[in-house]
Amino acid sequence: MDYGLTIGITTALRNGGARFAVACVVASVSSLLATAGWSQSLTWLGTLPGSLQSWAHGVAADGRVVVGRAWNSTSRQLRAFRWENGVMQDLGALPGYDQSEAYGVSADGSVVVGRAIDGATGQFRAFRWASGVMQDLGVPPGYDRSWAYGVSSDGSVVVGLATTPAQEARAIRWANGVWQNLGTLGGNRSFAYSVSSDGSVVVGVSRDATQRVRSFRWANGVMQDLGALPGYDQSYAWSVSADGSVVVGWASNAAGQYRAIRWANGVWQDLGVLGNGDHSEAWGVSSDGSIVVGLAYIAPGQSCAFRWTPDGGMEDLNQTYASVLTDGSALVAASAISPDGRYIVGWGINAATGRREAYLLDTGARCTPHSGDVDSNGCVDDADLLAVLFAFGNAGSNLGRVDVNCDQTVDDADLLAVLFNFGSGC
């Protein structure tokens, strides 16, 4: 069902992700000392028994819990999953429903939200899962369907959408067992996608009085039109920072161009594209609003997961973390990021299984200056010196411990730090 508002990720979510069939495939990079950092790792989450594909849509603060959905293309059924400690759990469905999808998770991973689906009728209902029980959140008065997308850090506030038999849609907010209709920007449809940490700020999209699709930010009972980028007439807000001050999403225009965007201090910023591509979408943002993730197309039908930072701009995660990717594997999209920016989830192509799978990327702890013990074995020795020499000249925001002084460049200063402290702790 398409309510005329959703393109990009939402359309992809509804049709099973078909638009991401072609991946941004890269060859793995081997190096003696994995300059990207010692603690970085990529975990393919697999899929549920009987399912052939999986997508991750949310991650807990510590990266231990990931939620999403798995798809059986034979039976054409979806199931919500919760992954923890290497095990993917099928969350089941509500009574009377045979399918489900999970989109949001609380900070501690204990609460999961999404929707249950009746495959025969197309009926769907928002759910909140906790302590092994899937709760039907019902619908607001006058509505017959509901869908949960986002949840507050403590799991007490849920946001999403409700629809009528006439296919009108409204952004909604659930708290204390009651759904609240957030209204629209003057049109007949609105969707809520994300909520601030404390549940007080909601972002999403709405049609305005002229039927343009616009991003909104709702707070204190007021829905604010966030406008769009110059040269773009529509905007889509998908995620919000912990305090509600930073919003990310994408803008589009009649020419079919899409740009990942970031809103702060009342202004939209164009986050750019990868390579010669002309299409990017931002889907997740860190707690402080400084790190953004999403997807960008480098060619028609060929998308790559990206990360954007104020200093580094937009980077292809397939290149930044090539050392943890095997030949033929690729990170197609990044859908969410942990509050501290360390963990990124999404989906890609796992060459080992030949299928689309959810992934968990641990980018490693943020850079902390040190005395030259690159491999953290307590001794500044030949191994540390070689690590810096092999990485010498590299630049970027994710160099790992070879960037001894954390200035985003492996240079003379890092080499001198190792030499000055050579032999320490040995």
Where do the protein language model's features map onto the residues?
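Conserved "turn/edge" positions that cap or connect secondary-structure elements
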Residues: 35-367
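A general, composition-driven signal for non-globular sequence regions
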Residues: 8, 13, 32-34, 395
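Exposed boundary/loop context
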Residues: 9-10, 30, 371, 401
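Ubiquitous "structural anchor" signal
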Residues: 25-26, 257, 386, 416
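N-terminal secretory signal peptides that target proteins for export/translocation
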Residues: 1-18
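Short linear sequence motifs
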Residues: 13, 31, 209, 383-385, ...
